[in-house]
Amino acid sequence: MSFKDRLFICSQYLLPHHLLSRLIGFAADCRATWFKDRLIAWFARRYQVDMREAQVEDLQAYEHFNAFFTRALKDGARPLAQEPGAVLCPADGAISQLGPIEHGRIFQAKGHSYSLAELLGGDAELAAPFMGGDFATVYLSPRDYHRVHMPLAGTLREMVYVPGRLFSVNQTTAENVPELFARNERVVCLFDTERGPMAVVLVGAMIVASIETVWAGLVTPPKRELKTFRYDEAARAPIRLEKGAELGRFKLGSTAIVLFGPQQVAFNDGLGAASPVRMGECLALPKQA
């Protein structure tokens, strides 16, 4: 590891993650025209954001930076894979890793893995259906479309907010911060689907001001403590989302991890670490019995 990378990793442990994220979140919600227009224009240039596919192409039309960052796309900008039974990629970005969940652990990077149960908030019961299953980790870069969509149609069963740190998420931290995704703040969404249980985990990172879902809005428990929200109780109307429907969004980006049970899916042979992906592309197909 280079000296520059060592310095970067050391800074990750020393910086006040949540304070920085709150300050950046405040700036991202600022509506002052002189500020938000300059910030959005700089960001679009810096990261070469393609606004031709956005519903609103005019950078100055966004009320604040977060509205720009979570911008909607034009109809048809992300066609859904048509293969029978296709499991869709949940987001734009790049595959960080994908493969089997072995011995209750998920591969992070060379020399590093993390606990499936810890990713899901330390709940062995929640983790049990995914033991021996498969995972895919999608990293969303700053220039990407930052809404997350359903890989399969499903009925929401449970949502778990898991407090944690906010380490930056990139190749350097993945290779050098142990248990990165099981340490960062995250929201776990559990669904019942035609392929059995499916989890979509929205992982925060440094400067990720908030995580939002379409059914709960901003997921911000008053105290930073683990909190479970159940949606399969008789008193609640079922929440069902169709394949390709928006699930949630990052107000400043990070990572989405999708989990499946054993013998349910076979990943697209053309995908591997660092493969670029777009929401709606074929991530996997049903595994043949």
Curated annotation (Swiss-Prot):
Record-annotated site: Cleavage (non-hydrolytic): G253, S254
Chief place of localization: membrane
UniProt KW keywords: Cell membrane, Decarboxylase, Lipid biosynthesis, Lipid metabolism, Lyase, Membrane, Phospholipid biosynthesis, Phospholipid metabolism, Pyruvate, Zymogen
PTM notes: Is synthesized initially as an inactive proenzyme. Formation of the active enzyme involves a self-maturation process in which the active site pyruvoyl group is generated from an internal serine residue via an autocatalytic post-translational modification. Two non-identical subunits are generated from the proenzyme in this reaction, and the pyruvate is formed at the N-terminus of the alpha chain, which is derived from the carboxyl end of the proenzyme.
Top-tier EC class: lyase
Domain of life: Bacteria
Annotated protein name in UniProt: Phosphatidylserine decarboxylase proenzyme
